[in-house]
Amino acid sequence: MGIEEFGGGQAAQADVLVVTTNDVPGYQVTQVIGEVFGLTVRSRHLGSQIGAGLKSMIGGELKGLTKTLVETRNQAMERLVEQARARGANAVLMMRFDVTEAADVGTEVCAYGTAAVISKV
């Protein structure tokens, strides 16, 4: 299993830059558009839950659940970028993830941040 299955992030040539910082070195914020978010809820897969339960008894990484969470975060990020792009932003500053259990049936992942327009200094 490669890094692409267990990692995430943004493509190098993305038209909407997403950062976890307040600013981007070499750029200035010319317009703050406001909060944007991308949200997804994934249901639990019974097979993964049984496997995770057994694995947790003997220890080790729960690779099936890890892969699902990575996919879920990546989908939330894609939706965040779509929202920012639709509002005319070319950057999302101060991006964060929030992960919550959703009524014992799944996991809610929200990627959120501040949509902005930035330009080179």
Swiss-Prot record:
<dbReference type="InterPro" id="IPR035439">
    <property type="entry name" value="UPF0145_dom_sf"/>
</dbReference>
<comment type="similarity">
    <text>Belongs to the UPF0145 family.</text>
</comment>
<dbReference type="InterPro" id="IPR002765">
    <property type="entry name" value="UPF0145_YbjQ-like"/>
</dbReference>
<dbReference type="Pfam" id="PF01906">
    <property type="entry name" value="YbjQ_1"/>
</dbReference>
<protein>
    <recommendedName>
        <fullName>UPF0145 protein SGR_4080</fullName>
    </recommendedName>
</protein>
